[in-house]
Amino acid sequence: MNMPIEVLMPIILLALALILISVVFTFIPVGLWISALAAGVNVGIFTLVGMRLRRVTPSRIVNPLIKAHKAGLRVTTAQLEAHYLAGGNVDRVVNALIAAERAAIPLQFERAAAIDLAGRDVLEAVQMSVNPKVIETPVVSAVAKNGIELRVKARVTVRANIDRLVGGAGEETIIARVGEGIVTSIGSSLSHEKVLENPDMVSRTVLAKGLDSGTAFEILSIDIADVDVGKNIGAQLQTDQAEADKRIAQAKAEERRAMAVAKEQEMIAYVQEMRAKVVEAESEVPRALAEALKEGKLGVMDYYTMQNIMADTSMRDNIARSSNSNTDSNPKK
């Protein structure tokens, strides 16, 4: 059954009105606007609409603004929105400003926003300025002049320096510098007993070096938590050096032995070479004698005299060899 247009028109208008109201309440955070008015914060409807158009969540701006207004801070909507669009944490910055205000720490919004955009936790920095933080260093090994190793563990009490949070070094630098100072201080000690008797000497020496320069912290104190005696590094190094010297000496002795063996073989070869030359020279003697006899330079009697001399020499050699062999076979008891 078809309803008359006079009956349908009010229903259509009511539906359109409900849709329009729902769209308005969805696009315009009326509840947030009412909360701001109740808190005494002047935020216009069109300001909230502009936030929607700029893809800014109004609650991320209005709630911190209400908090800052109640804390007595002079912060504008434009400042908070600009920091939000830059990728900052608006709520954390406002909390840091409130904490700094309560602790009487001078901190402006621009400075807090810069610290937050630099990746630092500005709220933690303010809290650390009020309540210093204790940093425990890992075990640091150092060797005194007498060669004894000491293993030291220290506690460093630091306070955040808000003025140096942007661009200042972090905790890792503090730990590295303290470890370096401990190694230097122990290394300059004559013996490890002095360090064990007076460990605060190390902490005073390290603290006097100004290790917090260029960092985001101010070192309040350095306390030696634990000192343990380690290895005798000096004796170990001496042992290693002696072993190395021994190996070097053995290598040099082996080199000299090899050179002596090579020299011996060289001399044997040289003797064989000389013997070959003697044999070669002896083979020329008969030819020379024949030449001398033929040319009349050597007489027959001279030749026989030389033969007698050679026979006597050979006989003496045989007698000498026989005497030596008898002596070797019958040694004296």
Curated annotation (Swiss-Prot):
Homology family: Belongs to the flotillin-like FloA family.
Protein's membrane topology: Multi-pass membrane protein
GO cellular component: membrane raft; plasma membrane
Keywords of the record: Cell membrane, Membrane, Transmembrane, Transmembrane helix
Protein name as catalogued: Flotillin-like protein FloA
Compartments (UniProt record): Cell membrane; Membrane raft
Domain of life from the UniProt record: Bacteria
Pfam families (UniProt xref): FloA
Organism: Desulfitobacterium hafniense (strain Y51)
Sequence intervals crossing the membrane: 8-28, 30-50
Encoding gene (name): floA
Function of the molecule: Found in functional membrane microdomains (FMM) that may be equivalent to eukaryotic membrane rafts. FMMs are highly dynamic and increase in number as cells age. Flotillins are thought to be important factors in membrane fluidity.
Listed NCBIfam families: PRK13665.1
Subunit structure: Homooligomerizes.
